[in-house]
Amino acid sequence: MRSLLLQRIFFFFYSFAWILAKPLLKKHKRLREGYAERVAGGAWSDMAEKKPVTLWIQAASGGEAYLTLALLKYIPKTHARCHILCTSMTKQGMEVLQKGKQAFEKAWREKYTEDCPKISLCYFPFDDKKSMQKAFLLARPKICILLETELWPHFMRLCKANKSLLFVVNARMTEKTHKAYQKIKWIFTGFNPDKIFATRKQDKAYYQDIFPQSTCVFMHNIKFDTVYQELNCAMQAAKDNSLKKVFAPNVCVYLFASVRQEEELELLALIEKLHAKKTKSAICIVPRHVARFAEWKKALQEKGLFVHFAAELFENNKQMQAQDIIVWNRFGDLKDLYALADYVFVGGSLAPLGGQNFLEALVYGIIPHTGIYLHNFLWAFEMQDKTKNLAEENLLCLHENTAMLAETFLALPEEKSTQHTQIQERFKIWLKPLIGDTKRIMQEILENAE
């Protein structure tokens, strides 16, 4: 009784907070984009004229939206008549979904003669009572999926009220988040997900603690499937690389990829030492954020180092030479850079920032060096059936600090790598036991749609 009373009090104040917040959110620089849909207007109004939603998949932002697309790949032709609603909270997420929808429809028509499943795209509504009730009334979903880390109280409450099955897929939860939810888990009493697919045993335990009435099981991360598919494409692709024209054939290249601002000072000192010792090598720096391009160039110049922007190489039809330092100020080139570099450090990992996608380096045939702060990628280290993790397989080099990274990089020979294909083959063998759960889980969920 006490927990139910607390729950009612929570939802009263939670709803009131949304009422106060919505006028401010309407003026918010990021959230005013698609505001009509965020209050279940706009494109949501068209949902009433469509058949009920078979499957509603919610992805917070761009990263999760790619997971939505991975799930869509495993919709069988027996579900050609289903209606799928894909939502996201950000402009980036919606752009990923829009592009992915077009690719999905094209691929479906090339593969099957049956009509393509209807896919609707909308911004995810604010989790206030009025907006979410309206969204459920219009969509009438049979099955709902939350991806990764999201738990929305009104959304979950309405899943139960409307008898919509709720699954949490690729579920993750940090220790900090778990401790916070432990204190208020009574909020979710009676609104538990029907099944939770967690990407680590620890995540499974965390979710089971918060939702004791839910079925919680382990799954291999969806990203293993997407990485495996990308690896196959990379290995089958033509050898042409648009960046080759700016890479001198005999110059060793050290690549610092997705470097974050919090790592700059320490890496600046390392790059200065590397430049002084590695006289036959070039150094290429790819900042994670565009605002840091000019800052990197300025900081290096203040050290007395001569620096080029990558765009200058292309404009002047020049190649990287030994002793060059290049700040890469072009977008969309990182994959091709991995394929051409000889040594790589992947950033976001020397400070507690969670890490950046080091698996992508392996896809293009180069062993990544990282720091130890990789908490966003812990799922890549939890192996089943005695499989060794990437570090144990010598497919990842971990460094506790910048000093260790410097010692390693300074000791490496100035040689062009000839191992890209062999590394890809080793990575493919490592990935093979970890793939397949995306298809299996999608099949299990869609069984409930029949």
Walk through the language-model features, giving the residues of each.
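Short acidic alpha-helix that forms the nucleotide-activated donor recognition element
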Residues: 130-139, 315-323, 332-342, 363
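Hydrophobic beta-strand scaffold residues
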Residues: 164-167, 307, 368
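Donor-nucleotide binding loops and adjacent catalytic segments primarily
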Residues: 83-90, 94-97, 254, 262-333
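Active-site and donor-binding regions of nucleotide-sugar-utilizing enzymes
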Residues: 26, 30-42, 48-238, 255, ...
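Catalytic binding pocket for nucleotide-activated donors in carbohydrate/polymer assembly enzymes
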Residues: 193, 334, 339-430
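A transmembrane-helix-recognition feature enriched in membrane-embedded lipid enzymes
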Residues: 1-38
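C-terminal alpha-helical cap of glycosyltransferases
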Residues: 433-450
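Short acidic active-site motifs
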Residues: 131, 155, 292, 329, ...
